[in-house]
A protein has these predicted regions:
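Gly/Ser/Thr-rich phosphate-binding loop
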Residues: 56-59, 152, 177-182, 191-252, ...
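Structural core segment of the AMP-binding/adenylate-forming
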Residues: 1-60
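ATP-dependent adenylate-forming carboxylate-activation enzymes
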Residues: 1-3, 17-23, 155-175, 184-186, ...
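Conserved ATP-binding/catalytic segment of the ANL
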Residues: 274-279, 283-344
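Conserved pre-ATP/AMP-binding loop-to-beta segment of ANL
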Residues: 59-86, 92-93, 119-130
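Conserved AMP-binding/adenylation subdomain of ANL enzymes
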Residues: 105-130, 137-179, 192-193
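A short helix-loop-beta submotif of the ANL/AMP-binding
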Residues: 1-12, 29-30, 129-130, 148-158, ...
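Adenylate-forming
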Residues: 96, 107-112, 169-171, 187-194, ...
Length: 344
């Protein structure tokens, strides 16, 4: 956090009250002004050691009515940074991934196509859904689904302040959650922990699993036991969130991470830089409207990862079949995983 505060030259720090102590310490180490830290939550908070509630930043109603939100042109939306998510490797400091407004909108639209393939989406005909938000909101996966996709599709999301497995099961039961967005460790818990059978999870019709490799054996076990369809997807911070996904209309049990999202190109490259054939292994390279702009203030890392013509070298080794389904089979370069979520 210290590195991120310094690296972005942040002007405001919004902190959930339970994390205030950690944030204040990081801000101190980064030389960040304490009066620029605000508590951020649904309910108003009393000042704690001089840290005020975020609502104290807000202007008056009169000032709000006079304010004109800037509108980005299509060109500006393509080049203007909307968010910087940090992606760590095994060595060195985390790298800030610059994602544009265009990247986010594109990835939402691409993902919607895969979700509703074969049953075009309209608000009138879309099935009633309820989601449970427990993925970290600092992670691209949580941002896209818990915030962006939910807003776009007008799906209610019940957001957990922290992940506790029994609370997770109880929330599914109480709120009749219909769709889950998970990483493999959650499916391991569903498969192995005895608490899983003590709650009614029948409302869940399907789950999307990403952020780390999932074995087809675990996928089959959870799918069979809980009568839910589990679809895999592949992505990374540098592609906003996703680039490959099994369409929701397909119940795949092969362990595939799916097919390319619309308007996404792919090459699999061997160690000599040559494109491989169907069924052969190669480094996954992606090009599309969801590929990030650059790494924040890290020109060398950008040059090493994104080619001048827009190809992103992912570091993942994959193969594909004649139908365009992909399997991730190895990692070309070492990666770092935290709490079951791949972060590079």
């Amino acid at each position: 956090m210290v590195h991120q505060i310094k690296n972005t030259e942040a002007r405001i720090l919004l902190v959930y009250p339970a994390l205030l102590k950690t944030a204040v310490q990081a801000a101190k180490e980064a030389g960040f002004p304490k009066d620029r830290i605000f508590q951020f939550s649904d309910k108003p908070n009393q000042s704690v050691d001089g840290i005020r509630d975020w609502r104290e930043m807000l202007g008056s109603e009169e000032e709000a009515n006079k304010y004109s939100w800037p509108k980005l042109s299509p060109e500006e939306a393509t080049t203007t940074v909307a968010t910087i998510n940090y992606s760590s490797g095994t060595t060195g400091l985390p790298k800030g991934v610059c994602v544009s407004h265009y990247n986010i909108i594109s990835n939402i639209e691409q993902t919607m196509v895969m979700k509703y393939l074969g049953q075009p989406y309209t608000r009138e005909t879309a099935p009633s859904e309820r989601w449970l938000g427990f993925l970290p909101l600092y992670h691209a996966y949580g941002q896209l689904w818990t915030i962006m996709m939910a807003l776009k599709l007008q799906v209610p999301v019940y957001v957990m302040t922290q992940f506790v497995y029994e609370d997770f099961l109880k929330a599914i039961q109480d709120f009749k959650i219909t769709q889950l967005h998970v990483a493999p460790p959650i499916l391991v818990m569903l498969s192995k922990r005895p608490e899983s059978t003590k709650h009614d999870l029948n409302s869940v019709k399907g789950a999307l699993c990403g952020a780390a490799p999932l074995s087809k054996e675990l996928q089959a076990d959870v799918s069979t036991r809980f009568k839910m369809q589990i679809n895999q997807g592949w992505g990374m911070t540098e592609v906003t969130t996703g680039a490959i996904m099994v369409p929701f209309a397909i119940n795949d049990d092969t362990g595939s991470v799916g097919q390319l999202l619309p308007n996404t190109e792919c090459m699999l490259i061997d160690d000599d830089g040559k494109e491989v054939n169907v069924g052969e292994r190669g480094e996954l390279c992606i090009r599309g409207p969801q590929v990030c702009l650059r790494y924040w203030r890290n020109e060398q890392a950008t040059k090493d990862t994104i080619t001048p013509d827009g190809w992103l070298k992912t570091g993942d080794v994959a193969l594909y079949d004649e139908k365009g389904f992909f399997w991730i089979v190895d990692r070309k370069k070492a990666s770092l995983t935290h709490a079951g979520m791949a972060v590079c």
